[in-house]
């Protein structure tokens, strides 16, 4: 994806496939607000009358398809994420991947660290409109439980920190202990969430204003 028009077209395609705006946000690595804006723009493109273009959201799109589409590259990045965790944190029992993109990364990390593998589906995957707090996420029963275990959390990007915070809360609610989070890209410069350190391979820093 090279420009906003590509993102709008992708958002339209995903919406036509029945994905919620929260799932679209996850697929395109943008915030929920940006996903909503992209979907609205894709519908506006079919309007017969010209309309004033709405101001776009303040967000950064991260396309890591070159990593995700290659098994070896994904493994190498997973090793780098695992190395970040080993440098500054204790040993975990479970590596929890946040669905969807965080799970393949967590698989590589768990293999490198020799932990079991957990998977968490965040509330945003059900989100289309309204208050996210009215929705709930959950752990997959097909993966390792977190109760009574020390956990690492893995995702691809940090946009606002909402999903990481939700996952941290969910692990604690299940009786587990979140030790640290790790991502490929941090858009916000997040160092910790609710007392849990957040590590990233890449930090995106805005310089000046658009």
Swiss-Prot record:
> Region labeled Disordered — which residues?
39-60
Query: Anything known on activity regulation?
Result: Interaction with effectors modulates GfcR activity. 2-keto-3-deoxy-6-phosphogluconate (KDPG), fructose-1,6-bisphosphate (FBP), 2-keto-3-deoxy-6-phosphogalactonate (KDPGal) and glycerol-3-phosphate (G3P), which are intermediates of sugar and glycerol degradation pathways, can act as inducer molecules.
Record has NADP as a keyword: no
Molecular function via GO: DNA binding; orotate phosphoribosyltransferase activity
Task: Name the InterPro entries on file.
Answer: GcfR_halob, GfcR-like, PRibTrfase_dom, PRTase-like
Q: What happens when the gene is disrupted?
A: Does not require uracil for growth, is partially resistant to 5-FOA (5-fluoroorotic acid). The deletion mutant loses its ability to grow on D-glucose, whereas growth on casamino acids is unaffected. The mutant also loses the ability to grow on D-fructose, D-galactose and the non-sugar substrate glycerol. Growth on the pentose sugar D-xylose is not affected.
Q: What is known of its domains?
A: Contains an N-terminal DNA-binding winged helix-turn-helix domain and a C-terminal regulatory domain (or effector binding domain) resembling phosphoribosyltransferase (PRT) domain.
Which family is annotated? Belongs to the purine/pyrimidine phosphoribosyltransferase family. GfcR subfamily.
Protein name per UniProt: Transcriptional regulator GfcR
Which species does this protein come from? Answer: Haloferax volcanii (strain ATCC 29605 / DSM 3757 / JCM 8879 / NBRC 14742 / NCIMB 2012 / VKM B-1768 / DS2)
Gene behind the chain? gfcR
């Amino acid at each position: 994806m090279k420009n906003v028009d590509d993102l709008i077209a992708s958002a339209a395609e995903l919406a036509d496939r029945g994905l919620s705006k929260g799932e679209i946000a996850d697929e395109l690595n943008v915030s929920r607000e940006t996903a909503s804006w992209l979907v609205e723009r894709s519908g506006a493109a079919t309007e017969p009358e010209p309309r004033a273009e709405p101001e776009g959201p303040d967000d950064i799109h991260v396309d890591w398809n070159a990593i995700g589409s290659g098994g070896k590259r994904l493994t190498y990045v997973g090793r780098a994420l695992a190395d970040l965790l080993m440098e500054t944190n204790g040993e975990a029992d479970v590596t929890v991947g946040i669905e969807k993109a965080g799970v393949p990364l967590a698989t590589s990390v768990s293999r490198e660290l020799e932990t079991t593998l957990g998977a968490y589906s965040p509330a945003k995957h059900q989100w289309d409109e309204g208050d996210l707090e009215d929705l709930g996420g959950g752990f997959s029963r097909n993966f390792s439980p977190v109760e009574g275990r020390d956990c690492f959390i893995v995702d691809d990007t940090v946009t606002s920190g909402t999903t990481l915070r939700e996952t941290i809360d969910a692990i604690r609610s299940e009786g587990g202990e979140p030790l640290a989070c790790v991502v490929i890209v941090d858009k916000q410069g997040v160092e910790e969430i609710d007392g849990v350190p957040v590590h990233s391979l890449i930090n995106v820093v805005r310089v000046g204003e658009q």
